[in-house]
Curated annotation (Swiss-Prot):
Biological process terms in GO annotation: photosynthesis; response to blue light; response to red light
PANTHER family noted in UniProt: UPF0041 BRAIN PROTEIN 44-RELATED
Encoding gene, per UniProt annotation: PSBS2
Transmembrane segments: 86-106, 120-140, 184-204, 219-239
InterPro entries noted in UniProt: Chloroa_b-bind (IPR022796)
Subcellular location: Plastid, Chloroplast thylakoid membrane
Stated family: Belongs to the ELIP/psbS family.
Principal place of residence: plastid
Name of the protein in question: Photosystem II 22 kDa protein 2, chloroplastic
Upper lineage: Eukaryota, Viridiplantae, Streptophyta, Embryophyta, Tracheophyta
Gene3D superfamilies hit by this protein: Chlorophyll a/b binding protein domain (1.10.3460.10)
Length: 254
């Protein structure tokens, strides 16, 4: 009996050593949480930061003329070209009408003339002011003129503050030519002509031709040749599309 008991004791010890101890449910739960945290840390994905377009920051502002982009209400040179063409048509028609009828622009519209400037119609004064500001580029002259390609090079008017650039002309080269830059120049001259002829007619009661002592109220075939040439020139310049284009800040070809 004693031998049997002594043999059973080592067997129980071996059995106890070979059996793995069981952990409590709380310990297993904590181990699972740690495992989940580690898996989440390695599998989490970070979103890539959006690419920043730096081209807008480095984009140069295209300005040309006396006042530049910041000096106006947003007019581009293409807008000025349209207004100038309308002014050329209006000035040519007013000169032709005065040469035939003998009446100035305001007299043809039955507006009061021969009065002080401060007694003129407010709408008429606003129109004169708007025309003067447009003629000198104060409404905004954003953009620059780019001539059509000739060979491998292009003639580009660089932004500047010179007198000729302010009038829409190239700093170098010929003065006149049927480009959009020269159209802009002729349109501004027509705007100045309309504005000053209106101011003179308000004060003196005489039209633009009467102020220059040119005979009016005659048939078309008896109009002075130089006057007829000017009328035809403004009319042709208004309807003739010039070469080249205008480039604005947004790189749009006008």
């Amino acid at each position: 009996m004693a031998l049997q008991q002594s043999m059973a004791m080592p067997m129980m010890v071996v059995s106890d050593l070979g059996t793995a101890p069981r952990s409590s449910p709380m310990v297993q739960l904590q181990r699972m949480k740690k495992h989940l945290v580690v898996v989440a840390a390695f599998k989490s994905r970070t979103k890539a930061s959006p690419k920043v377009d730096k081209s807008n920051k480095n984009k140069s502002i295209v300005e040309d003329g006396i006042f530049g982009t910041s000096g106006g209400i947003g007019f581009t040179k293409e807008n000025e070209l349209f207004v100038g063409r309308v002014a050329m048509l209006g000035f040519a028609a007013s000169l032709l009408g005065e040469a035939v009828t003998g009446k100035g622009i305001l007299a043809q519209l039955n507006l009061e003339t021969g009065i002080p400037i401060y007694e003129a119609e407010p709408l008429l004064l606003f129109f004169i002011l708007f025309t003067l500001l447009g003629a000198i580029g104060a409404l905004g002259d954003r953009g620059r003129f780019v001539d059509d390609a000739t060979g491998l090079e292009r003639a580009v008017i660089p932004p500047g503050k010179g007198f000729r650039a302010a009038l829409g002309l190239s700093e170098g080269g010929p003065l006149f030519g049927f480009t959009k830059a020269n159209e802009l120049f002729v349109g501004r001259l027509a705007q100045l002509g309309i504005a000053f002829s209106l101011i003179g007619e308000i004060i003196t009661g005489k039209g633009a031709l009467a102020q220059l002592n040119i005979e009016t109220g005659v048939p078309i075939n008896e109009i002075e040749p130089l006057l007829l040439f000017n009328i035809l020139f403004f009319f042709f310049a208004a309807i003739n599309p010039g070469t080249g284009k205008f480039v604005t800040d947004d790189n749009d070809d006008q």
